[in-house]
Amino acid sequence: MATSQKKNLLKKGFMFETNTSQSIEIGRVFYSHLKNKKKSLNIFTANVFDAISLKEELIWFYPELRINHLPDWETLPYDQISPHPELTSERLLALYQMTQNEFDINLLPITTALHFLPPKSYIEKFSFDFKVKQEVDIEAFKTRLIENGYFNVDKVLSPGEFAIRGSIIDIYPMGSIVPYRIDFFGNEIDTIRTFDVDTQRGLYPTNKIKLLPAREFPIDSDGVSQFRENYREKFNGDLSKSKPYKNISKGTPFAGI
């Protein structure tokens, strides 16, 4: 690969069409660059398939590289369905890790990159930790979860859900592959354990969990106010008949967003 081509690759981001020989050379160039600069790089691929293929090839040839892939929503712009909760969970984890510079290379299909992404400030504002022995007001905790986009349900089964039963809170954090059961003693977190969604039985103890926002947009009071203002500017007519306007005004997301 010519020197001029290598310099072009080391710009902040570039388009890439995958094949194995290119993957080997590009990985070598990136590895050398990252060792010296210690700054993550963005690669934009033509489609999701190229992103997945490139990730697999780079991991095979350069296992020491930390590679992040931001998944696509896998929905069309005007679909009346929302992305699958597990997919949203993967995206939010990837976005959070990008804000923390946890990876050497970020892979983004161009279809994914063309969508609006939440700013770093949003991810940081709505992410928080909980740990054993921490004092927490349960009602305030419930309010915060709802403002973060989590659904209050009877039984936790999917990412983005939580349930409260007396002094026990079950929650499936976005970005986590397992749900957690938080047991309180008064206002103090006594224990935190993972649990099985099928049997609902507790499994393994842990000392700390990370909670990411449940959505890529805010539905707290400030977010709802901004939505209402912008909606009134863009659309005319009787807003009382607008389902999106009414639902978001109540802080309730609807299918398709």
Q: Language model features by range: what are they?
A:
Residues 1-257:
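ASCE RecA-like P-loop NTPase motor cores
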